[in-house]
Swiss-Prot record:
Molecular functions per Gene Ontology: ATP binding; copper-dependent protein binding; GTP binding; heat shock protein binding; nuclear glucocorticoid receptor binding; peptidyl-prolyl cis-trans isomerase activity; phosphoprotein binding; tau protein binding
Phosphoserine carried by residues: 452
Protein name per Swiss-Prot or TrEMBL: Peptidyl-prolyl cis-trans isomerase FKBP4
Interaction with tubulin as annotated region, ranges: 267-400
Gene assigned in the entry: Fkbp4
Subcellular compartments: Cytoplasm, Cytosol; Mitochondrion; Nucleus; Cytoplasm, Cytoskeleton
PROSITE patterns: FKBP_PPIASE, TPR, TPR_REGION
Cross-link (Glycyl lysine isopeptide (Lys-Gly) (interchain with G-Cter in SUMO1)): 441
Organism name: Mus musculus
Activity-regulation annotation: Inhibited by FK506.
Subunit structure: Homodimer. Interacts with GLMN. Associates with HSP90AA1 and HSPA1A/HSPA1B in steroid hormone receptor complexes. Also interacts with peroxisomal phytanoyl-CoA alpha-hydroxylase (PHYH). Interacts with NR3C1 and dynein. Interacts with HSF1 in the HSP90 complex. Associates with tubulin. Interacts with MAPT/TAU. Interacts (via TPR domain) with S100A1, S100A2 and S100A6; the interaction is Ca(2+) dependent. Interaction with S100A1 and S100A2 (but not with S100A6) leads to inhibition of FKBP4-HSP90 interaction. Interacts with dynein; contributes to NR3C1 transport to the nucleus.
N-acetylmethionine modification, residue list: 1
GO biological process: androgen receptor signaling pathway; chaperone-mediated protein folding; copper ion transport; embryo implantation; male sex differentiation; negative regulation of microtubule polymerization; negative regulation of microtubule polymerization or depolymerization; negative regulation of neuron projection development
């Protein structure tokens, strides 16, 4: 029965008592949710916890009174399965449906609106009957940009509400697939933020941080959240490959949050993390290094309880972290972020040689030649022996000349085309105001013929 057929059928069942029938699909087998399939769906897949599902539905009381229908609104209803956004019976029943399936669901009050009901249409302790058609379902998008780069589908819900934070120690069992080929199967224990050293994609780590203990999920990764444009030779993954992971979070131990750490702990951990970040940077693992330096900033940025001697160490760590963040951003070609990190460093030390130089490099990379030149000139003013700044200043001036030459040529061509068009217009106007010799000769002949004709007629 299609959505249209459902609407036609409901008109003939406005007040007819509805029978209690169907297969008991309630978890407790207490006949709280009964299901009858009216039309089989297609395929074998059913929605998983967290999936976004799209349905049409009509709801009746047991006496046949219709109390709601998405068909009347001519708009499908959507919700996230298993998140408590709808009545319990729906979370249970829709999880058993296939795309295209139409079913009747009979819901006891404890799986519907309970003793309170939903005034004014649904009375207290009401048993309800729904007809539901499932149109589609899709996994949960975990990306901040909502670009579909990390999609999660939960096979088995975890326990509790706690999730791993940055720096947490996690124990996972995983399987990685490229198309249908199993390329990775491991049980690992590692610190969140260091997955790259174990050849784990950044998108998988992000997904793990959204999981609960015991959760078993499927994670789908677009190339930019997997192994990107370079692929992964170890696993024979080609460039621009989409991946699928089956991952189970067996256990985890959360890292201390900033507010849980004493000042001494923050200072101690910052020194450890700084060394780790430097090691990652030397290995060319810039994203991992970036995460380490960000930790230092988050721990020390607004901490004011240090002693005078400690404050000097904190100042040095903050300055080094912003400078190192800028360098990581430059390596990753995130030039706006590099400029921002340099600005933060220069707020701490306005004449810092590395801060000025790296900001100049970032400005140069995005063709802001005036700003780049100003930074390199200030470096040379403060540190005349800086050969790299002299070289970059020369590069900056050379590129400025090239740009001016290109602009000059562009404008010259533009003016030349405008002049040609203007000349063409003038020529056309002139041709229109002054007939050609041939046209004038033709006109004189016509006048002579007309005059001869007039004389003959006279």
């Amino acid at each position: 029965m299609t959505a249209e057929e459902m609407k036609a059928a409901e008109n003939g069942a406005q007040s007819a008592p509805l029978p209690l029938e169907g297969v008991d699909i309630s978890p407790k087998q207490d006949e709280g949710v009964l299901k009858v399939i009216k039309r089989e769906g297609t395929g074998t897949e059913t929605p998983m916890i967290g999936d976004r599902v799209f349905v049409h539905y009509t709801g009746w009381l047991l006496d046949g009174t219709k109390f709601d229908s998405s068909l009347d609104r001519k708009d499908k209803f959507s919700f996230d399965l298993g998140k408590g956004e709808v009545i319990k019976a729906w979370d249970i029943a829709v999880a058993t449906m296939k795309v295209g399936e139409v079913c009747h669901i009979t819901c006891k009050p404890e799986y519907a609106y309970g003793a309170a009901g939903s005034p004014p249409k649904i009375p207290p302790n009401a048993t309800l009957v729904f007809e539901v058609e499932l149109f589609e379902f899709k996994g949960e998008d975990l990306t901040e940009e909502e670009d579909g780069g990390i999609i999660r589908r939960i096979r088995t819900r975890g326990e509790g509400y706690a999730r791993p934070n940055d720096g947490a120690m996690v124990e996972v069992a995983l399987e990685g697939y490229h198309k249908d080929r199993l390329f990775d199967q491991r049980e690992l224990c590692f610190e969140v933020g260091e997955g790259e050293s174990l050849d784990l994609p950044c998108g998988l780590e992000e997904a793990i941080q959204r999981m609960e203990k015991g959760e078993h999920s499927i994670v789908y990764l677009k190339p930019s959240y997997a192994f990107g444009s370079v692929g992964k030779e170890r696993f024979q993954i080609p460039p621009h490959a989409e991946l699928r992971y089956e991952v189970r979070l067996k256990s985890f131990e959360k890292a201390k949050e900033s507010w849980e750490m004493s000042s001494a702990e923050k200072l101690e951990q910052s020194n450890i993390v700084k060394e780790r970040g430097t090691a990652y940077f030397k290995e060319g693992k810039y994203k991992q290094a970036l995460l380490q330096y960000k930790k230092i900033v988050s721990w020390l940025e607004y901490e004011s309880s240090f002693s005078g001697e400690e404050m000097q160490k904190v100042h040095a760590l903050r300055l080094a972290s912003h400078l190192n963040l800028a360098m990581c951003h430059l390596k990753l070609q995130a030039f706006s972020a590099a400029i921002e990190s340099c600005n933060k460093a220069l707020e701490l030390d306005s004449n810092n040689e590395k801060g000025l130089f790296r900001r100049g490099e970032a400005h140069l990379a995005v063709n802001d030649f005036d700003l780049a030149r100003a930074d390199f000139q200030k470096v040379l003013q403060l540190y005349p022996s800086n050969k790299a700044a002299k070289t970059q200043l020369a590069v900056c001036q050379q590129r400025t000349r090239r740009q001016l030459a290109r602009e000059k040529k562009l404008y010259a061509n533009m003016f030349e085309r405008l002049a040609e068009e203007e000349h063409k217009v003038k020529a056309e106007v002139a041709a229109g105001d002054h007939p050609t010799d041939a046209e004038m000769k033709g006109e004189r002949n016509n006048v002579a013929e007309n005059q001869s004709r007039v004389e003959t007629e006279a």
